[in-house]
Amino acid sequence: HNGLRVNLVPADELYNEFSSGTPDAGAYRRYLRMLQDRAEGNEANMPKYLLLFGDCVWDNRMLTADCKRLNPDDYLLCFESENSLNKIYCYVSDSWMGILSEGAGGSPTTQQQDVAVGRFPVSTPEEAKIMVDKTINYMENANAGSWQNTLMFMADDGNDNLHMKDADEVANYIADKYPDFQIKKVMWDAYQRTTSSVGNSYPEVTRIIKEQQANGALIMDYAGHASAGQLSHEQVVKLMDFNNFKNTNLPLWVTAACDVMPYDGVEDNIGEAAVLNPNGGAVAFYGTTRTVYANRNKYMNRAFLYRVLSTKDGKPLTIGEAHRQAQNDLVKGNVIGYDKEGKPITESDLTSNRLQYALLGDPAMPLNVPTLKVVVDSVNSISTSDASAKAMLKAGMVARIDGHIEGNEAFNGVVTATVRDSKELITCRQNDGTSDAFTFYDRTKTLYNGSDSVVGGKFSFQFAVPKDINYTDESGLVNLYAINNDRTIRAH
């Protein structure tokens, strides 16, 4: 699809050539290292992606009772850490297979990844078809629309508001780096919590998430507690939901939470359920395989989102390359900003925590990130290029917005606009008994949501300003998403 040269290599051939016929995950690395050596430094010939087309189990030899019933021919191997008993420090890592430097592999916590790695956790032809079809359909982008301009950030309560603080910080960071995306925040503690004989729940949060999942989003990002069977103690979204989702607009799910996708186990889990759901779920899943530290999850979450939304030479990074670069960022020290003196602020993680993160999906697939820019030329005939002028929207008036697609005068298609009111300070409810109420800023009021045509790269639309607006001098926000008629060019 993207002009890649692809090698399809049966696992048994790799074992024969690189591990003396014995099934060994190291054979995958040695094969990639051979390709790297043969490239002799020529970037065009270097191996870039490894798609592990097959599920795996922690018992690579399949000697235990749970694994004896499985057919080894239906599975690939995985790399398990030497410490395999501690839930926090043990890990399964596909990224290890992409560490190709001379003498590397023995200390993966401090070593950089050379090849982007992802996995299709499939063991039957039916499962394989599901993931292949999902990937092809996503790349063909038949369901393209403004839903692909939405990033939803979700955060659990508890832990002295840690998860909500982290999610809010990451969301604000991404909004600053990529202001053209529409950011939505769902903080558990901002909603009413109900209690019954089976425990606590957040019905409104569940409704909002399921509604967004049905409508679609580019990324659904969650920070908080989790297990293989549920997100948060309140079971806001459960394994059964991921099995039953019916949505054609497939997001990338990202979870900065414990144990969401232990794909080397024999029990069902949310990560695999999301990508193997034939009727919806996710096009790919980026999450953790074991218990992780919440304070370090923020580092990985921020680094991955920054990379996966970025572009290079006018093209979005692939999800596998984003994973590789994010992992390497935390080894080198990720620069997330600068202090008042201009010195870089960095985040690093040389622990096994970052190795808990894995990608279920095609590493060579990019997200459908818009690559062109939509420019607002004027609001109510007041030019946006005039810094001294300020367009005021008043309740009951008809507002007009004119704009164009930058660098493409031949663009014909549709533009979708979402106009939101000024930011509001939201104070949470302290449902979990925290000493201080968590507060965050969000845009909760939508003034207009609609579409209009783009002709010759230009557009204009009007809308009536509602009466229940925030009566302040603070700025509103216009998010725009445009797609051409043959659905091959996107802008925001």
Language model segments and positions:
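Cysteine-dependent hydrolase recognition
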Residues: H1-A464, T472-E474, A482-A491
